[in-house]
UniProtKB/Swiss-Prot annotation:
This is Small ribosomal subunit protein uS14. Keywords: Ribonucleoprotein, Ribosomal protein, RNA-binding, rRNA-binding. InterPro entries: Ribosomal_uS14 (IPR001209), Ribosomal_uS14_bac/plastid (IPR023036), Ribosomal_uS14_CS (IPR018271). SUPFAM superfamilies: Glucocorticoid receptor-like (DNA-binding domain). One of its GO terms (biological process) is translation. The gene is rpsN. Binds 16S rRNA, required for the assembly of 30S particles and may also be responsible for determining the conformation of the 16S rRNA at the A site. One of its GO terms (cellular component) is small ribosomal subunit. The keyword Ribosomal protein applies. Part of the 30S ribosomal subunit. Contacts proteins S3 and S10.
Length: 100
């Protein structure tokens, strides 16, 4: 189980990403369309003034049960350990053990 502080930090990042998504997209579009170098530099500065944790690249997928950041399955939102355990218990509809 991940530390609660790490899980909360990731939740805070998610909130910041959602809060600043429109502003960030707008600035990036302005940057793309700007032709003057001084304008581009100013827009880039505005982008850099946004909170660091509002960048989507800082988001880390975590298991919603354990908070584990590695071995994450996007389809389920679970780590490999929980996925295996729940699949064996039959808690995941449609998931069956492979056999050939």
């Amino acid at each position: 189980m991940a530390k609660k502080s790490m899980i909360e930090r990731e939740k805070k990042r998610s909130r910041l990403i959602a809060k600043y998504a429109d502003k960030r997209a707008e600035l990036k579009e302005q940057l793309r369309q700007a032709e003057d170098l001084d304008d581009k530099i100013e827009i880039q500065r505005q982008l850099q003034r946004l909170p660091r944790n509002s960048a989507p690249s800082r988001h880390r997928n975590r298991c919603w049960v354990t908070g584990r950041p590695r071995g994450y399955y996007r389809d389920f939102g679970l780590s490999r350990n929980v996925l295996r355990e729940w699949a064996h218990q039959g808690l995941l509809p449609g998931v069956v053990k492979s056999s050939w």
